[in-house]
C-alpha cells in the first residue's frame, strides 16, 4: 500500500475570520449531484431553492462566520486543569507543613517580638529616623 501525501505547494483550504475568502473550495472532489448543482448555479440564482443555495455555500466553505465565531468549551478544560494543579500544590504544602517543617522558632511568638521591641527601645536603636524616634520616652508610649 502506497500512502499518497498531500502536495503542500498548492493552496490549502482554511476557515479564518481574518481571511474570509480562501483560495480553494472546501470540497475538492465533487459528486455527481454537486456537479449538477454547480451547473444549475450558472443560471439565474432566483431559480435556486434555499437548500440548494446552502449546499452551494457548503461546497465553497466549511463553516459560516456565525459558526466560526461560536465559542468553544475549551476554557472549561483549561480552568479545570489549573484548579487541579492548584489543589494538588495546596495538598503538597499542607503535607510539608505537617510532616517536613518543624515548629516555628520562639522569635515568631508575639511575646518575644514585644520583648525584642522593648529591648530595642531601651537601647535607643536608630534615634534619628528609626524606631526610637517614634517612641516618647517621657510618656512611655508611641508618639502621635
Swiss-Prot record:
Its main location: mitochondrion. GO terms for biological process: mitochondrial electron transport, cytochrome c to oxygen. Keywords: Acetylation, Membrane, Mitochondrion, Mitochondrion inner membrane, Phosphoprotein, Transmembrane, Transmembrane helix. The keyword Protease does not apply. SUPFAM superfamilies: Mitochondrial cytochrome c oxidase subunit IV (SSF81406). The chain crosses the membrane at residues 74-99. Residues 1-73 are mitochondrial matrix. The modification Phosphoserine is found at residues 31, 33. It is found in: Mitochondrion inner membrane. It comes from the Eukaryota. GO terms for cellular component: mitochondrial inner membrane; respiratory chain complex IV. Residues 100-144 are mitochondrial intermembrane. The modification N6-succinyllysine is found at residues 4, 35. It is a single-pass membrane protein. Pathway: Energy metabolism; oxidative phosphorylation. The modification N6-acetyllysine is found at residues 4, 28, 35, 42. PANTHER family: CYTOCHROME C OXIDASE SUBUNIT 4 ISOFORM 1, MITOCHONDRIAL (PTHR10707:SF12), CYTOCHROME C OXIDASE SUBUNIT IV (PTHR10707). Component of the cytochrome c oxidase, the last enzyme in the mitochondrial electron transport chain which drives oxidative phosphorylation. The respiratory chain contains 3 multisubunit complexes succinate dehydrogenase (complex II, CII), ubiquinol-cytochrome c oxidoreductase (cytochrome b-c1 complex, complex III, CIII) and cytochrome c oxidase (complex IV, CIV), that cooperate to transfer electrons derived from NADH and succinate to molecular oxygen, creating an electrochemical gradient over the inner membrane that drives transmembrane transport and the ATP synthase. Belongs to the cytochrome c oxidase IV family. Component of the cytochrome c oxidase (complex IV, CIV), a multisubunit enzyme composed of 14 subunits. The complex is composed of a catalytic core of 3 subunits MT-CO1, MT-CO2 and MT-CO3, encoded in the mitochondrial DNA, and 11 supernumerary subunits COX4I, COX5A, COX5B, COX6A, COX6B, COX6C, COX7A, COX7B, COX7C, COX8 and NDUFA4, which are encoded in the nuclear genome. This is Cytochrome c oxidase subunit 4 isoform 1, mitochondrial. It comes from Gorilla gorilla gorilla. The lineage of its organism: Eukaryota, Metazoa, Chordata, Craniata, Vertebrata. The gene is COX4I1.
Amino acid at each position: 500500500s502506497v500512502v499518497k501525501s498531500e502536495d503542500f505547494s498548492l493552496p490549502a483550504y482554511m476557515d479564518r475570520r481574518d481571511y474570509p475568502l480562501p483560495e480553494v473550495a472546501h470540497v475538492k472532489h465533487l459528486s455527481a449531484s454537486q456537479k449538477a448543482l454547480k451547473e444549475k448555479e450558472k443560471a439565474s440564482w432566483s431559480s435556486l431553492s434555499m437548500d440548494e443555495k446552502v449546499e452551494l455555500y457548503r461546497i465553497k466553505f466549511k463553516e459560516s462566520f456565525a459558526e466560526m465565531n461560536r465559542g468553544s468549551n475549551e476554557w472549561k478544560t483549561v480552568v479545570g486543569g489549573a484548579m487541579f494543579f492548584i489543589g494538588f500544590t495546596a495538598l503538597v504544602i499542607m503535607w510539608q507543613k505537617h510532616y517536613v517543617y518543624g515548629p516555628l522558632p520562639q522569635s515568631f511568638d508575639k511575646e518575644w517580638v514585644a520583648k525584642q521591641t522593648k529591648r530595642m527601645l531601651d537601647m535607643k536603636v536608630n534615634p534619628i529616623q528609626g524606631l526610637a524616634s517614634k517612641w516618647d520616652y517621657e510618656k512611655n508610649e508611641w508618639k502621635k
